[in-house]
């Protein structure tokens, strides 16, 4: 059984999420200790438990230690159970983070099209917003042959949650590698600024701040607005945020986002997202840093060698590489490349569950 120190590297829930996915795919059981040991609220929290229980349902796994605050967990996967699933995180726990566990599995198992109905948080701190999944991650996974459709039914913000998302995944069968080491020419920049249970001007100001910042750099984004009339807002809220993305002539998308919070001016929210997107564009990296670490488990399972660049070698990227190497006999290297970081992945096909 593989043993993982949950305090390694970035020491967060990503270690568990990646391990769950690769355990199901390879059939290798694991035990993780010191789960989130260096966090202010150590151990498993509700959104981590949601990932564990969803992974266990899909794989008929035997699980020990799945309770709030648990510092260790044993996971022994069985056979993958194909079908559609409803998952209720039960809090404002991030839907996007639960998807980080499930998407690699559904991308490669022979289950045909699978639909997930997930309730929880769509726009919450320390997690990719659902718009990043919809407009950036789903697009980039399509380059590998994975079909993902994300339908946002209702947003859920911290602390009330209540967001609803329907995700349909059509597996690739065999994942295609990605070889993109430069950003390339931009086809366009788009965005979505939203505000729920808040005045419409919040969404407008977020968008304008992002547009103003990018315009000074010679970039012309097209940012859509999402807000609701008082009395016709179906969300629990309140909350706001903005997601920006750019598509390259090389085919890939880069993204950036910022979340509103009490006392934070809407202008700061919009500008933060614009600054983050501009940093990737100025560096000429093929992918933003968040996408860079998300791609690791997928490309480690792909049919062939992959190369791509990111702006920085983050702790999340290094940690994901370490976890992948525990489950897959893949050769993954990082190196400095034209003031960027190049990631090279040479997969050695691992056994896959039917």
Curated annotation (Swiss-Prot):
A GO BP term here is:
RNA processing
- Localization in the cell: Cytoplasm
User: May I have one GO cellular component term?
Assistant: cytoplasm
Primary location recorded for the protein, binned into one broad class: cytoplasm
Sorted alphabetically, which CDD domains does this protein's record hold? Answer: RNA_Cyclase_Class_II (cd00874)
Q: What does this protein do?
A: Catalyzes the conversion of 3'-phosphate to a 2',3'-cyclic phosphodiester at the end of RNA. The mechanism of action of the enzyme occurs in 3 steps: (A) adenylation of the enzyme by ATP; (B) transfer of adenylate to an RNA-N3'P to produce RNA-N3'PP5'A; (C) and attack of the adjacent 2'-hydroxyl on the 3'-phosphorus in the diester linkage to produce the cyclic end product. The biological role of this enzyme is unknown but it is likely to function in some aspects of cellular RNA processing.
SUPFAM superfamilies reported for this sequence:
EPT/RTPC-like (SSF55205), RNA 3'-terminal phosphate cyclase, RPTC, insert domain (SSF52913)
Per its record, the protein catalyses: a 3'-end 3'-phospho-ribonucleotide-RNA + ATP = a 3'-end 2',3'-cyclophospho-ribonucleotide-RNA + AMP + diphosphate
Claim: Cytoplasm is one of the keywords in the record? yes
- The protein, known as: RNA 3'-terminal phosphate cyclase
Q: Which residues form the active site?
A: 316
Protein family membership: Belongs to the RNA 3'-terminal cyclase family. Type 1 subfamily.
Where on this chain does ATP bind? Answer: 100, 290-293
Q: Does the keyword Ligase apply?
A: yes
Please give the Pfam families that the UniProt record associates with this protein: RTC, RTC_insert
Q: Which UniProt keywords apply?
A: ATP-binding, Cytoplasm, Ligase, Nucleotide-binding
Q: Which GO terms describe its molecular function?
A: ATP binding; RNA-3'-phosphate cyclase activity
The protein's matches in InterPro entries, at most eight in alphabetical order, are given as:
RNA3'-term_phos_cycl_insert, RNA3'_phos_cyclase_dom, RNA3'_phos_cyclase_dom_sf, RNA3'_term_phos_cyc, RNA3'_term_phos_cyc_type_1, RNA3'_term_phos_cycl-like_CS, RNA3'P_cycl/enolpyr_Trfase_a/b, RPTC_insert
**PANTHER family in UniProt:** RNA 3' TERMINAL PHOSPHATE CYCLASE (PTHR11096), RNA 3'-TERMINAL PHOSPHATE CYCLASE (PTHR11096:SF0)
């Amino acid at each position: 059984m593989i043993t993982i120190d949950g305090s390694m590297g970035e020491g967060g829930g990503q270690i568990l999420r990646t391990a769950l996915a690769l355990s199901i795919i390879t059939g290798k059981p694991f035990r993780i200790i010191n789960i989130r040991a260096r966090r202010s609220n150590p151990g498993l929290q509700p959104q981590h438990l949601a990932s564990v229980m969803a992974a266990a349902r899909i794989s008929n796994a035997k699980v020990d230690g799945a309770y709030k605050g648990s510092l260790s967990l044993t996971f022994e996967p069985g056979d993958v159970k194909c079908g559609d699933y409803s998952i209720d995180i039960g809090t404002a726990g991030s839907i996007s983070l639960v998807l980080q566990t499930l998407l690699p599995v559904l991308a490669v198992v022979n289950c045909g099209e699978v639909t997930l109905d997930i309730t929880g948080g769509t726009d919450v701190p320390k997690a990719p917003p659902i718009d990043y999944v919809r407009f950036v991650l789903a697009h980039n996974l399509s380059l590998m042959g994975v079909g993902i459709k994300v339908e946002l039914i209702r947003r859920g913000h911290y602390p009330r949650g209540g967001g609803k998302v329907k995700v349909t995944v059509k597996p690739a069968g065999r994942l295609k590698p990605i070889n993109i080491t430069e950003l390339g020419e931009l086809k366009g920049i788009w965005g979505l600024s939203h505000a729920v249970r808040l005045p419409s001007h919040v969404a407008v100001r977020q968008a304008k701040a992002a547009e103003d910042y990018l315009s000074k750099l010679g970039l012309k984004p097209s940012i859509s607005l999402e807000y609701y009339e008082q009395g016709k807002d179906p969300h629990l809220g309140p909350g706001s945020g903005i997601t920006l993305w750019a598509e390259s002539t090389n085919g890939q998308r880069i993204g950036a986002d910022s979340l509103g919070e009490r006392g934070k001016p809407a202008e700061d929210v919009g500008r933060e997202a614009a600054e983050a997107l501009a940093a990737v564009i100025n560096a000429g990296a093929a992918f933003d840093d968040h996408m860079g670490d998300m791609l690791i488990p997928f490309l480690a399972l792909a049919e062939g060698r992959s190369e791509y660049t990111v702006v920085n070698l983050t702790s999340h990227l290094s940690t994901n590489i370490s976890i992948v190497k525990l489950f897959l006999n893949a050769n993954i290297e990082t190196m400095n490349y034209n003031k960027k970081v190049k990631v090279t992945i040479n997969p050695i096909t691992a056994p896959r569950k039917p």
